[in-house]
Design a protein with these regions (language model features):
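Hydrophobic/aromatic-enriched cytosolic interaction surfaces used to assemble or bind macromolecules
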Residues: 1-258
């Protein structure tokens, strides 16, 4: 049982998470600025999809291009020294199925130690590039890695970071600046989340007194998740606690708050 949550804040969140973005999920878009966010399901898009999205784009961002952040499928992290671009599909398909109509985008982590092989929907890549040639196309896990690595490299104990989103959660385990483990797991309730979380902890033989567990952000919609972990782990902390309240949680709330 934690005696009380500790809150920590490395640098500033806006150094790592864009303040204006279009977040692409399997079932829709989330348009985000610090003042407002709106989730638009694909099933609600009108017949004139292009015209509607261009109008929504201008309403939120004017002539300033946002970042396009892809959440549809998990990315694969490959050590820079071992990476060969011609083998990116082989790397990825050994990790996860490459869905039809998706292509692989290769990015660098900020510390230049890893290549991030990330699937993006070809349709939306082409669409947004037509809207603005210089638009940034990013995978959300690359952004998360950069943020949590910047924090963990200053710590002496192992750090396990948890990012919660609709239908899934991400884990990153660091020892100092070095990534030891990462993965994304499906979840739709607290029990499933706790099962996978503690399966990983046991598989990696992590002594609870030897690592700190961080949630990214702290949101009312996930209180049951925090409570569930606090019953089993003593070093529970939160990074970038957001004071904004919203009765309807965003699909990935950590990316919709600054």
């Amino acid at each position: 049982m934690v005696t009380g949550p500790r809150f920590s804040m490395p640098a500033t969140k806006s150094q790592f998470i864009p303040q204006k973005s279009i977040q692409v999920f399997l079932d829709g878009f989330c348009f985000y600025t610090p003042q407002h966010w709106e989730f638009i399901p694909f099933k609600n898009l009108p017949t004139d999809t292009q015209g509607f999205l261009e109008e929504t784009f201008k309403k939120y961002f004017g002539n300033q291009p946002p970042s396009i952040i892809h959440f549809e499928h998990p990315a694969l992290f490959v050590p820079q020294a071992l990476f060969e671009n011609s083998k990116k599909e082989d790397y990825y398909t050994h990790y996860n199925t490459l869905a039809e109509a998706f292509e692989l985008n290769v990015l660098d982590t900020e510390d230049k130690t890893l290549k991030v092989v990330a699937p993006i929907a070809s349709k939306w890549k082409s669409f947004f590039k037509k809207m603005h040639a210089n638009i940034d196309i990013i995978n959300y896990q690359n952004l998360l890695y950069n943020l949590v690595q910047s924090h963990s490299k200053t710590q002496t104990s192992k750090q396990l970071f948890v990012h919660l989103q609709n239908g899934a959660f991400d884990l990153f385990l660091f020892d100092g600046a070095n990534l030891l483990f990462n993965n994304r797991f499906a979840q739709n309730n607290v029990d499933t989340f706790l099962y996978f979380l503690f399966y990983v902890v046991e598989t990696l033989k992590l002594d609870q007194d030897a690592f700190d567990l961080y949630f990214l952000g702290k949101y009312d919609s996930y209180n049951a998740y925090y409570d569930g972990v606090s019953n089993f782990h003593n070093n529970l902390q939160y990074l970038f606690v957001d004071d904004q309240k919203n009765t309807t949680p965003a699909p990935a709330p950590f990316f919709c708050s600054h």
